[in-house]
Amino acid sequence: MNIILFGPPGAGKGTQAHRLVHDFGMVQLSTGDILRQAVKEGTEVGKIAGELMKAGKLIPDDLMIRILGERLDKPDTKNGVIFDGFPRTKPQVEALDKLLAERHSKLDCVIEIKVDENALVKRIVGRYVCAQCGAGYHDEFKRPHKEGVCDICGSTEFKRRPDDNEEAVRARLVEYHEKTAPILPVYEARGIVAYVDGMLPMGDVATKIAEILKEKGAKPISA
C-alpha cells in the first residue's frame, strides 16, 4: 500500500510515519534522505544531484523523479511506501502517478492530519531536545521528570531548533498553504483522502491511521 501523510509542518507526520514503518513494514521515503543516499552511493543520478547541490542549485523535478524511481525499485518497498515531502506541486502529483503506473502500482490513500494552527504553533515553539541523545521534550506537554536533566541519558544540555520560533513557524505555515495545500483537492477528487484529528494524543492519532489503512486492506506485519 502506498500512502501520503499530509498536513502542515509540525502536524506529527514524521512521528506517525515511524509508527507505520514499525507496525505495517512500510518504508518511509523522504526526498531529502533519498537524495543524500543517492549522492553517497554515487549512482549516475546521484552524481548529477551532488554537483547541483555543491553549486547551491535546486534539484529539478525530472532528476528527483529518477532518484525516487530508483529507490522504489529496491526490494524493501514490497509492503508499500509512505511518501514524505513529495509531491508538493501539481506537476509532481502527475509525475508520481506516472512513476507508480510504470511499476504497475498506484497511490492508495492520502491521510490528512488536521490541526488547529494556533495550537500547532504552541506545540512547535515549545519543543526542545537533549543535546546528547536527541530525546524530545516540550515546555508544557513533556518536561523531564527531573528539571534540567534528560530522562534517557542524564545530560543537562538541551537545544532548540533555530527556526522553532513563532515568526518562523507562521512563515512555514503560510508557505505550506500557498505551495503545498493546493494539491489536496486533486486527491480529494479521486476519493482517496481520509482525515484524522491531529490534536488527539499521538497514540490515538496512530490508532486512527491504522484503522483507515486496515479498512483499505493493509495488514500489520505482526498479524
Curated annotation (Swiss-Prot):
Group of enzyme by EC: transferase
Key words, A-Z: ATP-binding, Cytoplasm, Kinase, Metal-binding, Nucleotide biosynthesis, Nucleotide-binding, Transferase, Zinc
InterPro entries: Adenyl_kin_sub, Adenylat/UMP-CMP_kin, Adenylat_kinase_CS, Adenylate_kinase_lid-dom, ADK_active_lid_dom_sf, P-loop_NTPase
One Gene Ontology biological process: AMP salvage
UniProt cross-references to PROSITE patterns, sorted A to Z: ADENYLATE_KINASE
Family to which this protein belongs: Belongs to the adenylate kinase family.
Alphabetical list of PANTHER family matching this protein: NUCLEOTIDE KINASE
Protein name, entry field: Adenylate kinase
Source organism (scientific name): Zymomonas mobilis subsp. mobilis (strain ATCC 31821 / ZM4 / CP4)
